[in-house]
Curated annotation (Swiss-Prot):
Database matches in SUPFAM superfamilies: Ribosomal protein L22
Disulphide bridges: none
InterPro entries reported for this sequence: Ribosomal_uL22 (IPR001063), Ribosomal_uL22_CS (IPR018260), Ribosomal_uL22_euk/arc (IPR005721), Ribosomal_uL22_sf (IPR036394)
Quaternary structure and partners: Part of the 50S ribosomal subunit.
GO cellular component: cytosolic large ribosomal subunit
PANTHER family in the cross-refs: 60S RIBOSOMAL PROTEIN L17
Pfam families: Ribosomal_L22
Name recorded for this polypeptide: Large ribosomal subunit protein uL22
Species classification: Archaea, Thermoproteota, Thermoprotei, Desulfurococcales, Desulfurococcaceae
Amino acid sequence: MPTWHYSTDIAEKNPEKTAKAMMWDAPISPKEATELARVIRGMKLTEAKAYLERVIKMEEPVPYRRYHGKVAHKRGLADKHGIPMGRYPVKAAKYFLKLLKNVEANAEFKGLEVEKLKIVHIASHKGMTIKRWMPRAFGRATPEFERRTHLEVIVEEVE
């Protein structure tokens, strides 16, 4: 049986002021998860949740810094983030919002104030790939691969 660990030891240095949460095998793209994690890293928890709500409503795009090949420019994105390419990863934003609500519940259970929580660590890692093959004509087959992503977040109470 495997054991899962966080990719950092921030929470072990100050366990009474931090809360953490994980999500394994989320059915979202690892590339979209990487871009979303980069944007909300360092935000206050309430700001990050509001930002993800706007992404889900397709009101505010997510800047794509690394995986931006053939990605269209979005109005106002370059002024705010310094990069004009972006998209609206709605499905990934829903899973990130679920993760942030989970870490908020964990923080409340530990007695931390939600308004003072800041995201000090958030990361996404490639998970397993579920491989399926759709039979086609003349004995061929088309791959239908479903990628999974592991997510982790650590929040800390700041003054």
